[in-house]
């Protein structure tokens, strides 16, 4: 029998959920029939999910998500959270929290934290030369050094993360959970700036340069989020969860930065993972460590299947931690609808849900 303190987290990319006539990319719109089909599919998935906390991505309109919950018959069961009151421009994240869980606080991040900087100066030759190498011509020493100078001027998220503090309305022994709902920059190449003075020179290489720009931005966003997470997680026992379309695989550099690469316990006699103050554990990895079926994916591109949508949890959800409050039960992925030529009424991403049982250490 399920304990009311058990909890499940889900991530769902809505794939451009917008009201009829509302503008999307390149002026695209839905007619009423297309909107009805999209709302019907979204509502059906919400009913299947049965998750306590859901993070959404690619939402254009508040009303569209309200309509989906109404169609699913779940309006009274969930409280919805958006990045701000009123309307917004472009796609955003949103969230839903099911009773008896409640939203205690909400916070949006747009600017990178002040501590976040991706710059590195040129190293002066005096710092490169060792005392016993003073007789070596400086130009020869410099030629053998790696040039690590960098100046990356990104200072805001492309899509604002939303942080919720989620509490239990009936149990005082359950600590509030800090939930970050995220959507990092996509892998799709960024369009080049046509006004750039070297645009014509760059144009033949637009795909490579655009992909590099997207990768750099996604890495910067992961780093900024890591800085924010560390400020919230260090030196306290606040359970923390990161949900969302992170647009990279679990072993990618993006996820390594974001998770801080905690150790997993892979055999019973190990003492690994007893403590990790600000690391985040991947529900995908936890599922893979306990099942013979390792074929998990939430996205398909040119035949390549990978997990881009993640549930990352702090040590309070890891069963081998001395600070455990919950233990991982299972990860489920709905991905039958994810095909190269998927139906526009559905999504181009799989939907993930991770369940955790209340089991304090």
What residue spans do the PLM features occupy?
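Metal-dependent phosphoester-hydrolase catalytic domains
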Residues: 1, 103-107, 119, 156, ...
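N-terminal, active-site-proximal structural segment of metallo-dependent hydrolase catalytic domains
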Residues: 1-93, 199-201, 237, 326, ...
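Active-site-proximal beta-strand elements of phosphoester/diester hydrolases
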Residues: 6-19, 176-185, 205-211
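Catalytic metal-binding/acid-base residues of hydrolase active sites
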Residues: 15, 59-60, 185, 246-249
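Short, solvent-exposed loop/turn elements at domain surfaces
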Residues: 17-22, 188-190, 320-321
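Stable alpha-helical elements in mature extracytoplasmic
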Residues: 38, 42, 61, 218-221, ...
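Structured beta-strand-rich core segments of catalytic domains in phosphoester-bond hydrolases
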Residues: 59-63, 67-187
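A long, amphipathic alpha-helix that forms part
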Residues: 208-236
């Amino acid at each position: 029998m399920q304990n009311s303190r058990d909890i499940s987290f889900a991530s769902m990319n809505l794939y451009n959920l917008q009201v009829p006539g509302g503008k999307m990319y390149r002026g695209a719109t839905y007619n009423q029939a297309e909107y009805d089909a999209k709302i019907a599919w979204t509502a059906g998935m919400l009913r299947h999910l049965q998750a306590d906390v859901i993070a959404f991505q690619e939402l254009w309109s508040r009303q569209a998500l309200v309509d989906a919950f109404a169609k699913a018959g779940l309006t009274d069961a969930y409280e919805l959270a958006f990045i701000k009151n009123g309307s917004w421009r472009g796609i955003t994240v949103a969230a839903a929290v099911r009773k008896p869980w409640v939203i205690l606080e909400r916070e949006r991040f747009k600017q990178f934290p002040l501590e976040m900087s991706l710059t590195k100066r040129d190293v002066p030759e005096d710092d490169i030369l060792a005392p016993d190498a003073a007789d070596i011509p400086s130009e020869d020493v410099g030629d053998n050094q790696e040039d690590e100078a960098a100046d990356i001027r990104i200072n805001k998220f492309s899509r604002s993360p939303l942080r919720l503090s989620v509490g239990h309305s009936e149990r005082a022994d359950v600590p509030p959970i800090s939930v970050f709902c995220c959507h990092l920059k996509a892998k799709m190449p960024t369009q080049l700036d046509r006004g750039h003075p070297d645009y014509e020179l760059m144009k033949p290489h637009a795909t490579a340069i655009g992909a590099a720009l997207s990768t750099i931005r996604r890495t910067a966003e992961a780093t900024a989020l890591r800085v924010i997470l560390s400020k919230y997680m260090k030196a306290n026992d606040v359970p923390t969860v990161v949900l969302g379309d992170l647009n990279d695989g679990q072993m990618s550099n993006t996820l390594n930065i974001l998770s801080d690469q905690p150790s997993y316990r892979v055999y019973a006699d190990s003492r690994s993972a007893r403590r990790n103050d600000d690391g985040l554990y991947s529900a995908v990895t936890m599922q893979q460590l306990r099942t013979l079926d390792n074929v998990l994916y939430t996205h398909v591109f040119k035949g390549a299947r990978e997990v881009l949508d993640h549930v990352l949890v702090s040590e309070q959800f890891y069963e081998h931690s001395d600070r455990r409050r919950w233990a991982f039960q299972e990860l489920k992925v709905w991905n039958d609808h994810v095909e190269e030529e998927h139906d526009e009424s559905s999504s181009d991403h799989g939907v993930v849900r991770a369940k955790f049982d209340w089991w304090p250490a």
